[in-house]
Amino acid sequence: MTTSSSGSVETSANSRLGTFSFASASFTDLLGGNAGAGGGGVSRYKAMTPPSLPLSPPPVSPSSFFNSPIGMNQADFLGSPVLLTSSIFPSPTTGAFASQHFDWRPEVAAAQSADQGGKDEQRNSYSDFSFQTAPASEEAVRTTTFQPPVPPAPLGDEAYRSQQQQQPWGYQQQPAGMDAGANAASFGAAPFQATSSEMAPQVQGGGGYSQPQSQRRSSDDGYNWRKYGQKQVKGSENPRSYYKCTFPNCPTKKKVERSLDGQITEIVYKGTHNHAKPQNTRRNSGSSAAQVLQSGGDMSEHSFGGMSGTAATPENSSASFGDDEIRVGSPRAGNGGGDEFDDDEPDSKRWRKDGDGEGISMAGNRTVREPRVVVQTMSDIDILDDGYRWRKYGQKVVKGNPNPRSYYKCTTAGCPVRKHVERASHDLRAVITTYEGKHNHDVPAARGSAALYRPAPPAAAATSSHPYLPNQPPPMSYQPTGPQPYALRPDGFGGQGPFGGVVGGSSFGGFSGFDDARGSYMSQHQQQQRQNDAMHASRAKEEPGDDMFFQNSLY
């Protein structure tokens, strides 16, 4: 009995030492030896060699984190089945290693995400041991790069973090195999077009608004268009606008339908352009703006057409594209192929087209503004006689002046001159008369012949009893230095009457301070008035009437 007990103690001791000395002996052998009868179980278990682990040590092996006891080889520990069956065979060797707790399962790692403070570096170092992420292909990188970020899926922190680290690399550094076509396809609008239509207007650069393609089409087609009508059509919620090419004699027109938010929904062209595209549109618009500024006023406020007998005579205006109020005074473009558009035009626009042939057409069939002459006089009456005959056709109150403005037109047939008269807002005695255009005729004769036989000055009456001799020049060349108290009517051009008499003396009746432009304008009228006076004086001498005998009897 003593011998057997001592032998069992020696066997158990030897077996424990063999656990640390031999790769084939382990604590499992002791269990097999004690349970088997006659030692047959132990020999049968020893005949079965443990399978070798098919693991190759990675660049950073987890074995470097183990604190092995002195005298123990790490290779023996990897060859032992204790590493794989520690949960099945309870043994004192299971908790013998005082190292950190390792769990290679991703579920446990996800549950311990709150304890990431001091273990992030360790997880990154050995994450390739358990979850070795394969390098993504070029197609995968393209898809991942431009897709919007998604919430992390429940696959572990390490895998999601490695996926997020690949995104900036794929965006900033283009792979070697990606060509221009593939890159353009990767930037395609598939991820963005899947959203609702509210995401259609994308914001670019510094906050600019990217218009839809259909809206850029109307503004960037290279041609100049003028809007001439707009109306609400049946069967459509959007209003329809009508445009016409501004090039002379170009029959091209187009219809544009816009939605309520301003986006273009449909564009229909009618006809073809018979000219090339303009070279520089901005230069033409700049010159038009310069003409408007040079004219010194807005012609749109003169609504000529109320009493003139014609239907809304189009005024002199520069070509302003896309403006509904301004007309171009060129002849109407050919109607070939434009009947469909003319049927849809509003009635008011058709009326305005009846007067397209009127106006002053200059070079290039484009209407040019005539110069303006502004004369300011001090008078208590509104009607100032300048020698021409005028017809009043309108009156209205303009912005910035409480006094009404009266509009006049020259009564001579074919004369384009117009004027408007108003009193200044700061001084009620100041009458401002603005002339537009130039007269293409002479100054008409005054109504009646009494003006031709007005009494001569006292000095002229002393030298001759007959004021009008056949070889004597008319008295219009005489300009006395003293005031003339017998002026027949006030005058609006510095005191110079229409028939040569000086009103108000050498000081021009107090109407001083005119500039050179007004002076040249008045000198032109003076020459015309002198010619008319000479003509009427010669006719009066050739055919004397009863008034002549009556005048001679007075002297």
Swiss-Prot record:
The lineage of its organism: Eukaryota, Viridiplantae, Streptophyta, Embryophyta, Tracheophyta. Residues 133-183, 197-248, 270-365, 514-555 are annotated as: Disordered. Residues 466-555 are annotated as: Transcription repression of gibberellic acid (GA)-induced promoters. It comes from Oryza sativa subsp. japonica (Rice). The gene is WRKY24. Expressed in aleurone cells. Mostly expressed in aleurone layers and leaves, and, to a lower extent, in roots, panicles and embryos. The WRKY domain is required to bind DNA. One of its GO terms (cellular component) is nucleus. Belongs to the WRKY group II-a family. This is WRKY transcription factor WRKY24. It is found in: Nucleus. Residues 277-294, 310-320 have a biased composition (Polar residues). One of its GO terms (biological process) is response to gibberellin. A motif (Nuclear localization signal) lies at residues 253-259. It comes from the Eukaryota. Transcription activator. Interacts specifically with the W box (5'-(T)TGAC[CT]-3'), a frequently occurring elicitor-responsive cis-acting element. Negative regulator of both gibberellic acid (GA) and abscisic acid (ABA) signaling in aleurone cells, probably by interfering with GAM1, via the specific repression of GA- and ABA-induced promoters. Residues 214-278, 379-444 bind DNA. Residues 163-183 have a biased composition (Low complexity).
